[in-house]
Amino acid sequence: HLLSRRQRQMCIRDRAYKKILDKLRELTGGNQTLDMFIANYVYEKEGAHHKKVMHYTNLPQNHIFTWNDVSRFRKGQYILMHSVIYRTKLLRECGLELPKHTFYVDNIYVYKPLPSVKTLYYMDVDFYRYFIGREDQSVNEKVMISRIDQQINVNKIMVDEFDLWKIPNRKLRHYMFNYLEIITVISTIMLIRSGTEENLLKKRELWKYIKDQDIRLFHHLRAGIMGNAMNLPGKGGRKISVAAYRLSQKVVGFN
């Protein structure tokens, strides 16, 4: 769907928008079917002069490629809704359905179709501007904590969606593990940050849910640096968890 002029001015760069549309028209007329188109997005934080551009230097540029051609994603580098355009028929064929009246479903939107994606194209242009830092924003920590049940629901849906060990392509499997890991880390740290006994119980229940669903996945997530840091025991351990998350935000740009 084409965006209105006002939406384009607020969220996306017109020059990049035109380049992408031209390239999509060109690729649509080609011999090879394209499943996913990727472009850069920009974090623009309210009140800050520095803008963080999410580039994908690990991806081949300006030609169609497959997962086999992808280099390793670094920590903090994810394909988000702001950077991806899926082929519409692929979304229908993979059975994508998003929970209604729920925040944070953009993670399901990006995650669910990935195993169906065989061909990709990356254009190194800064397309979408993602404005962050507003107090009423859904990714604001206080807002996320108030909606934590919706975040947990999305997290569980992603856990249930696939047996990741059966994803045949090793590079895709590794990326999907990393994506599920950061979603689980975010759920966990928000539950810790709330400071309530009720939410600490929800934290334990979330990890038990993962363990009950897939014991190998549970151990894989727990064995990672962030997984370990999120599950340190006691009040002191929780302080270390929050400090580790804050450090990760600064070092690798978690939002």
Language-model features: locations:
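Single conserved hydrophobic/aromatic residue that forms the stacking wall/gate
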Residues: 1-14
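Donor-binding/catalytic cores of nucleotide-activated saccharide
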Residues: 13-121, 128, 132-144
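Inter-domain helical "communication" segments and dimerization helices
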Residues: 26-33, 48-61, 70-73, 92, ...
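Inter-helical turn/loop segments and adjacent helix faces that build the functional surface
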Residues: 98, 165-171
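Catalytic core of nucleotide-sugar-dependent glycosyltransferases
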Residues: 125-134, 140-167, 186, 190-216
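Amphipathic alpha-helical protein-interaction segments enriched in hydrophobic
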Residues: 170-189
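Membrane-interface aromatic/basic loop that binds lipid-linked glycans or pyrophosphate carriers
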Residues: 193-255
